[in-house]
Curated annotation (Swiss-Prot):
Family to which the UniProt record says this protein belongs: Belongs to the HisA/HisF family.
Localisation per UniProt entry: Cytoplasm
Reactions catalysed: 5-[(5-phospho-1-deoxy-D-ribulos-1-ylimino)methylamino]-1-(5-phospho-beta-D-ribosyl)imidazole-4-carboxamide + L-glutamine = D-erythro-1-(imidazol-4-yl)glycerol 3-phosphate + 5-amino-1-(5-phospho-beta-D-ribosyl)imidazole-4-carboxamide + L-glutamate + H(+)
Active site: 12, 131
Protein name: Imidazole glycerol phosphate synthase subunit HisF
One Pfam family here: His_biosynth
Highest taxon in the source lineage: Archaea
Length: 268
């Protein structure tokens, strides 16, 4: 494990405000993403993700303003996702001060946006976000994944916040995304998201082993050990979490100290 592993808090935004409840002592405004991100910055976050969950044209100007304020106040990489559909959208977000953009549904619908974005701005700016769900109906052309309970499945890419199936194999899509120019994969398993039983290690490991770019594990953290498993068993380069940090169940510093005590290389 030569590379330093990253811990990344994620903030869900709607109309420029944080929507998942946040429970920090001493916050003037629990809904202000820049104040929250600054708190995470102080705790030692390696990066912050802003996800615009109600992305619309009306919201875009508000989001640009938030990104600008965040870029002025934070000294850590900022990734922004949600509703980014075109190269112009990518350009606007990066110009506002974000370091990376995360493409999800738009990448499935128009994969060329990955090629064009990486060509113009560099693949280090383009994160392919994959939402995936288990599918037990095996067929040709999919990657069989053996689960801990002995069952075999494949993982299907889902879009529009998990509401629509695509028939696309998750491992193949990760590989295609990287070929097109994605410099990172942000993987969220719908099986584990929000359940706090740990990351979906089988698909995280499968994708980590099949692409040569960093993989961020997302969805399911509930304990310190879950972070460790994400890195060691899931082979992820970074772990992303939201509610465990927002509700003060653990701090980024406590996660990093735990990981360091178990031999995982982190920036303290």
């Amino acid at each position: 494990m030569g590379l330093t592993r990253r811990i990344i808090p994620c903030l869900d935004l709607k109309a420029g405000r944080v929507v998942k409840g946040v429970n920090f002592e001493g916050l003037r405004d629990a809904g202000d993403p820049v104040e929250l991100a600054s708190r995470y910055n102080e705790q030692g976050a390696d990066e912050v993700v802003f996800l615009d969950i109600a992305a619309s044209k009306d919201n875009r100007d508000t989001m640009i303003d938030v990104i600008g304020r965040a870029a002025d106040e934070l000294f850590l990489p900022l990734t922004v996702g949600g509703g980014i559909r075109t190269v112009k959208d990518i350009q606007d977000i990066l110009r506002a001060g974000a370091d990376k953009v995360s493409l999800n549904t738009s990448a499935v619908k128009t994969p060329d946006v990955i090629n064009e974005g990486s060509h113009l701005f560099g693949n280090q700016c383009i994160v392919l976000a994959e939402d995936v769900r288990r599918n037990y109906e095996m067929r040709d052309g999919v990657t069989p994944i053996h689960l801990a309970d002995g069952r075999v499945c494949w993982y299907e890419v889902v879009i529009y916040g998990g509401s629509q199936r695509t028939g696309i194999d998750a491992v193949s899509w990760a590989q295609e995304g990287v070929k097109r120019g994605a410099g990172e994969i942000l993987l969220t398993s719908m099986e584990t998201d929000g359940v706090k039983t740990g990351f979906d290690l089988e698909i995280t490991a499968a994708i980590s082993e099949n692409v040569d770019v960093p993989v961020i594990a997302s969805g399911g953290v509930g304990t310190l050990e879950h972070f460790y498993d994400g890195f060691v068993k899931g082979k992820a380069d970074a772990c992303l979490a939201a509610s465990v940090f927002h509700y003060g169940e653990m701090t980024i510093r406590s996660v990093k100290e735990y990981l360091a005590s178990r031999g995982v290389l982190v920036r303290l």
